[in-house]
Regions:
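Contiguous, structured surface segment used for ligand recognition
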Residues: 1-64
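Conserved, mostly hydrophobic/aromatic
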Residues: 19, 72, 112, 269, ...
Length: 406
């Protein structure tokens, strides 16, 4: 666990991290305490000048996270993140590339997060296709994962790898090539800290292809998971139960899970919301005892039916706290992944999610509404805090009635 300890020793501030990430968290905590926003780069938030800083020497602080793996998913990036990156800081690759990912990874550490699902729309170059990206994951000690199976980025990588489109992305008809596709990524990633998504869906966020009827789909997924576990064993060496894995029962996959799909006990069940920030299903008492634990994939942005919301972030801290506190109380403590869309519209709400992931008791549902004022005060100063908080609270109230896109 990436924890840190701070204390004074002979008039020196000592920060000890349980891991390199823990040390980074401790250093960035000092930065936070003296008024530096985690978004100092992303939002140009300049800290207020301080002529003097004081540090009390009468206490030792130890901090550790409530949730083990916590991070963000860049998604639906075509209209903002992608064109911005390729026209500004990543002109060399003309895509979301290492300069963008370096800033995202620093932001994750500043927010005490540790996990990244990189952008994966069809026009976004796959994270693992650039050596510079991979070096960043090591440099910043970020745990890499993906919403696509086995660390792949299907929309960018599958056609380039296979020469086929969605028609070839069926384990029922093309198991040998798909197995090779997954195995090559597992081998490539063996020296990196990573969490593997197991199971399978079709391309373009659709159901599994090539299996007619629920019974056939269950049998097919069972074969798929067995093949993936063998890849993990062969490519990473040793016991697959020691390699972090998640299964995400998203959309139709939840129906299949509830119909009896068996997931190995060491795999984290990453439950889902309904795309609008309300959790669909909580783990049972038996599921909470799984050795792999439980997690949540949560949306602050969504592109799809019946209603998209990517222009403005509309999920209030009160709703987030109610749902994620409920998740935590029901055993979802291993993995929290937040879909932030292009990030910019959801910066404040994502910061709130990571505040909860670090200390789930910091913003309980009954006081979460005060986060807007706390955020406004630390970002813009006390003179503007009340007015800005009122504006944000009214925004959340109106957005709860109707999304801006509608």
């Amino acid at each position: 666990i990436s924890m840190f300890l701070k204390f004074l020793l002979h008039e020196a501030l000592v920060i000890l991290g349980g891991t390199p990430r823990g040390t980074a968290y401790g250093l960035f905590e000092v930065s936070r305490r003296i008024g530096v926003s985690p978004y100092i780069w992303w939002a140009d938030v300049q800290p207020a000048p301080q002529s003097t800083l004081y540090l009390s020497g009468d206490r030792t602080e130890v901090e550790a996270p409530s949730v083990q793996y916590r991070g963000l998913f860049i998604n639906d990036e075509d209209w903002a993140m992608l064109p911005w990156a390729k026209n500004t800081i990543d002109q060399a690759v003309k895509n979301i590339g290492p300069n963008t990912y370096a800033q995202l990874m620093e932001l994750l550490l500043r927010l005490r997060a540790n996990c990244l699902w990189p952008a994966k729309h069809a026009q976004s170059q796959a994270f693992w296709s650039l050596e510079a990206n991979k070096r960043l994951a090591k440099k910043w000690a970020i745990v890499m994962s993906s919403g696509d199976s086995m660390l792949r980025d299907n929309l960018w990588e599958w056609r380039r790898f296979s020469g086929t489109g969605s028609e070839g992305f069926s384990f029922a008809y093309n198991s040998a090539q798909i197995t090779d596709y997954w195995a090559k990524r597992a081998g490539e990633a063996r020296d990196y800290e990573a969490i593997y998504d197991i199971g399978m869906r079709g391309l373009q966020d659709v159901a599994l292809l090539g299996y007619e009827g629920q019974e056939a789909q269950l049998a097919g997924l069972t074969d798929i998971i067995a093949a993936q576990r063998k890849i993990i064993t062969d490519s990473l060496g040793g016991d697959p139960t020691q390699v972090p894995q998640i299964y995400i029962p998203y959309k139709e996959a939840l129906t299949l899970y509830n119909a009896g799909l068996q997931i190995p006990d060491d795999v984290t069940l990453c439950w889902v919301d309904d795309n609008y920030a309300y959790i669909r299903q909580l783990p049972t008492a038996a599921e909470q005892l799984r050795s792999g634990g439980n997690g949540i994939y949560y949306h602050l942005s969504y592109l799809g039916n019946p209603c998209s919301y990517i222009w403005l972030s509309t999920i209030s801290p009160s709703l987030i706290s109610y749902e994620l506190s409920k998740a935590y109380q029901n055993g979802m403590t291993r993995f929290w992944m937040v879909n932030v869309g292009d990030l910019k519209p959801a910066e404040v709400e994502f910061e709130f999610c990571m505040e909860l992931a670090w200390n789930v008791h910091a913003w309980t549902p009954e006081k979460a509404w005060t986060f807007s004022r706390w955020w406004a005060a630390k970002t813009f100063g006390e003179d503007y805090a009340d007015e800005l908080a009122e504006i944000r609270l009214e925004h959340y109230r109106l957005a709860a009635q109707s999304k801006p896109e509608t």
